[in-house]
């Protein structure tokens, strides 16, 4: 039986009617995303002077088309499939054929032994993360993540009743700051949340980094007497540059829950399609997937559309042409370091994270926007002040035209 109670509400009189509102979410409405502020400024300014005069590096929206295979499969499904089946409800865990296809793809590519019972289809990585966290945490538990990190981790974790602890960044490498991490471990820690390749730094955690992390977690599991889950946020898994060591994290630690999205790898952010894959060696692996289906009853999540699940089966072993991202990275890294900017070279994604030229990165980014129409976002949002993020999922032409603006920005401070 599900207990019912009223939490965090107040009674208001408005037009002589009693209205119940939730104070927690009401307070959130006044805390808008800084990234969104810059994005909105770019659109407003672009409406005045023309978007071609705005150099918008604020948002991580893929700039390359979906593989033709996906488009062809969508057309084929619409032309040949029974429309009733095509537009019917999906089972709560996802279509069996899609879940099995995902498992087969992971097994083939990474030498794993997933079955469909280890796969839960989701509305991209955000939904996968929210479900994974609810599977393994409760009120009073603790989740650890590492700066710089995706700001939405805060509501994902606090929505479970758990506490999010953020380990300060090692800004010399942006690999895991193990000294601070080990100080923060305690019996309340139920999960570690990582993102590699990383938004916003573009850094990829090496095999050595993940192996060391796994060894520490195994030792602490024995000490504390309970599993510590590694929740791996992997929407950029396929965007890794030449020669970069990029391990499949689930291969290196048993209690790993992989949260994946097709938004970046095959340019499907609007379709909201991804999955949660529980390592078969994970404690209660199959049970966690069944639990995710029950959690959906509380979150209102009811699987991605059936047609999108069917179509994505055709691109499980494909990507969009991602080469433009490495081209853009190479140009920006070469030119910005020539100018004098300091940064750790990205190993993947379509982000880089240079040091700002003043400690107040927020002021630095607003000056770039208002004086140069150059839209970049401050690192404070990622709990890494003194840095700024460049999202280079744009045309190479825009990257090349923006270099003189980055040089002008540098000269404003040096």
Question: What are these language model-derived features?
Answer:
Residues 1-15:
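Single conserved hydrophobic/aromatic residue that forms the stacking wall/gate
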């Amino acid at each position: 039986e599900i207990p019912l109670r009223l939490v965090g509400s107040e009674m208001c009189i408005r037009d002589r009617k009693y209205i119940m509102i939730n104070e927690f979410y009401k307070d959130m409405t006044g805390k808008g995303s800084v990234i969104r502020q810059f994005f909105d400024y770019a659109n407003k300014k672009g409406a005045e002077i023309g978007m071609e005069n705005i150099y918008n590096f604020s948002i991580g929206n893929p700039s390359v088309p979906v593989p033709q295979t996906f488009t062809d499969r969508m057309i084929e499904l619409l032309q040949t499939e029974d429309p009733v089946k095509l537009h019917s409800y999906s089972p709560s865990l996802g279509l069996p054929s899609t879940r099995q296809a995902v498992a087969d793809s992971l097994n083939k590519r990474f030498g794993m032994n997933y079955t469909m019972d280890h796969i839960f289809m989701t509305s991209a990585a955000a939904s996968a993360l929210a479900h994974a966290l609810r599977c393994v945490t409760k009120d009073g538990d603790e989740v650890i993540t590492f700066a710089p990190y995706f700001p939405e981790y805060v509501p994902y974790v606090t929505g479970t009743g758990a506490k999010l602890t953020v380990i300060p960044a090692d800004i010399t490498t942006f690999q895991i700051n193990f000294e601070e991490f080990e100080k923060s471990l305690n019996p309340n820690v139920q999960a570690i949340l990582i993102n590699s390749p990383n938004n916003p730094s573009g850094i990829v955690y090496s095999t050595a980094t993940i192996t060391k992390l796994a060894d520490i977690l195994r030792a602490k599991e024995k000490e504390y007497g309970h599993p510590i889950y590694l929740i791996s946020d992997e929407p950029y898994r396929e965007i890794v540059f030449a020669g970069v060591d990029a391990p499949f994290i689930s291969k290196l630690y048993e209690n790993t829950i992989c949260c994946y999205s097709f938004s970046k790898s095959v340019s499907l952010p609007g379709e909201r399609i991804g999955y949660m894959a529980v390592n078969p060696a994970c404690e209660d692996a199959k049970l966690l997937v069944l639990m995710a289906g029950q959690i959906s009853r509380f979150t209102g999540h009811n699987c991605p559309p059936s047609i999108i699940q069917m179509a994505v089966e055709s691109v499980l072993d494909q990507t969009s042409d991602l080469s433009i991202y490495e081209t853009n990275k190479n140009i920006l890294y070469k030119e910005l370091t020539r100018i004098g900017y300091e940064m750790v070279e990205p190993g993947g994604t379509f982000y880089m994270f240079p040091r700002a030229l003043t400690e107040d990165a927020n002021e630095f980014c607003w000056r770039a926007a208002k004086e140069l129409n150059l839209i970049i976002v401050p690192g404070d949002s990622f709990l890494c002040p003194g840095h700024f993020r460049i999202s280079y999922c744009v045309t190479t032409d825009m990257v090349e035209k923006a270099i003189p603006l980055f040089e002008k920005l540098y000269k404003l401070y040096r």
